[in-house]
Amino acid sequence: MIDFDGYRPNVGIVICNRKGQVLWAKRYGQNSWQYPQGGINDGETPEQAMYRELYEEVGLTRRDVRIVYASKQWLRYKLPKRLLRYDSKPMCIGQKQRWFLVQLMSDEKNINMNCSKSPEFDGWRWVSFWYPVRQVVSFKRDVYRKAMKEFACFLFDANKTVNPLSTNNNDEKKANYSAKKPYSPYRNQDKKRKTRV
């Protein structure tokens, strides 16, 4: 489903834990990381699409999370020319996304990247709130920044307010890597951080 302007309706999902960290997922077979996201099907509301994608991509159900906040407007990004499919009709030039901030209410052991026939991700870790804005592929960076700015005042842990604007980088240093096998950091700077902990 592509709109009149060439954008595909989509949802993006930021999953936070009680420490104020967010789930950062590694794309299957790649050294590329992003938040869970996916298209909205015909007849589906953004919230229904979010719950479907949440299960398909990370194995969580509506019982495992609670919605903290949903973005008020569509956020758009254009695809780079190298990713455009010029032969498709109508042609998709990018994504327009509704973003959801959800809090993980169940055990993180319920996270499962293999709930669909074609998994999107093969690893994940908890990172600090602003870390993904600096690390995501460049053409998604502006949308991530806008979504995270909108979510910043809603992020909290169980007992106290978390300040996502903090410059404390301890969350990245202590990032938990998870997958079937222990995940080794993909960048030299992450390797250095891991050895300092």
Curated annotation (Swiss-Prot):
SUPFAM superfamilies: Nudix. Its EC number is 3.6.1.-. GO terms for cellular component: cytoplasm. It comes from the Bacteria. InterPro entries: Nudix_hydrolase (IPR020476), NUDIX_hydrolase-like_dom_sf (IPR015797), NUDIX_hydrolase_CS (IPR020084), NUDIX_hydrolase_dom (IPR000086), RppH (IPR022927). A motif (Nudix box) lies at residues 38-59. Residues 6-149 form the Nudix hydrolase domain. One of its GO terms (molecular function) is mRNA 5'-diphosphatase activity. Its cofactor is a divalent metal cation. Keywords: Hydrolase. PROSITE patterns: NUDIX, NUDIX_BOX. Residues 165-197 are annotated as: Disordered. GO terms for biological process: mRNA catabolic process. Pfam families: NUDIX. Belongs to the Nudix hydrolase family. RppH subfamily. Accelerates the degradation of transcripts by removing pyrophosphate from the 5'-end of triphosphorylated RNA, leading to a more labile monophosphorylated state that can stimulate subsequent ribonuclease cleavage. This is RNA pyrophosphohydrolase. It comes from Mannheimia succiniciproducens (strain KCTC 0769BP / MBEL55E).
